[in-house]
């Protein structure tokens, strides 16, 4: 007997903006797919030359900053928490708390489609722990473990 397939969800940019407060120029996830509540999700970031960070990082050699790859993984995780706990339009915030073992494996440049796969290591309450891997065309670009805190509005 095979296990029943887990229900998966996706979040377009409208739902993402109903869950997380980030906006231009710091909204770093365009879509989240393959969301399995309380387990995992895949965020998508289409990297373009029009991004403001390329003005200074680096002139003539645009490279997407590694810290923003980590932030994109964190935003993907926040959307996963929001979908898992039905937080759209409820004023909840998911705050990035810490990061461990961040490693950068390849450059990310304009034209790349960055896929951030995040997996819950511990969650369901106020503090969540994740494992994240970002890749381009199946090639690992960055990885890290990180934690976040859920802040629900009072009242």
Curated annotation (Swiss-Prot):
Catalysed reactions, semicolon-separated: a (3R)-hydroxyacyl-[ACP] = a (2E)-enoyl-[ACP] + H2O
Locations listed in the record: Cytoplasm
A Pfam entry, by short name: FabA
Domain of life the protein comes from: Bacteria
Main localization of the protein described in the UniProt heading: cytoplasm
One MF term in the entry's GO annotations: (3R)-hydroxyacyl-[acyl-carrier-protein] dehydratase activity
First and last residue of the signal peptide: none
Keywords: Cytoplasm, Lipid A biosynthesis, Lipid biosynthesis, Lipid metabolism, Lyase
Assigned EC number: 4.2.1.59
GO cellular component terms listed in the entry, alphabetical order: cytoplasm; membrane
Enzyme class, first EC level, given as a word: lyase
Positions of the catalytic residues: 57
Function: Involved in unsaturated fatty acids biosynthesis. Catalyzes the dehydration of short chain beta-hydroxyacyl-ACPs and long chain saturated and unsaturated beta-hydroxyacyl-ACPs.
Similarity comment: Belongs to the thioester dehydratase family. FabZ subfamily.
Protein name: 3-hydroxyacyl-[acyl-carrier-protein] dehydratase FabZ
Organism in which the protein naturally occurs: Cereibacter sphaeroides (strain KD131 / KCTC 12085) (Rhodobacter sphaeroides)
Gene name per UniProt: fabZ
């Amino acid at each position: 007997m095979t296990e029943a397939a887990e229900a998966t969800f996706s979040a377009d940019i409208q739902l993402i903006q109903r869950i997380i407060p980030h906006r231009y120029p710091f909204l770093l996830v365009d879509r989240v797919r393959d969301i399995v509540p309380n387990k995992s999700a895949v965020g998508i970031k289409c990297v373009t030359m029009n991004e403001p960070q390329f003005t200074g990082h680096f002139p003539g050699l645009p490279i997407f900053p590694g810290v923003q790859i980590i932030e994109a993984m964190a935003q993907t995780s926040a959307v996963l928490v929001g979908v898992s706990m039905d937080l759209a339009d409820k004023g909840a915030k998911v705050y990035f708390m810490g990061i461990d073992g961040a490693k950068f494996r390849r450059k990310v440049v304009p034209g790349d489609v960055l896929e951030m796969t995040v997996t819950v290591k511990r969650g369901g309450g106020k503090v969540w722990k994740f494992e994240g891997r970002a890749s381009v065309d199946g090639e690992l670009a960055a990885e890290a473990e990180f934690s976040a805190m859920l802040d629900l509005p009072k009242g």
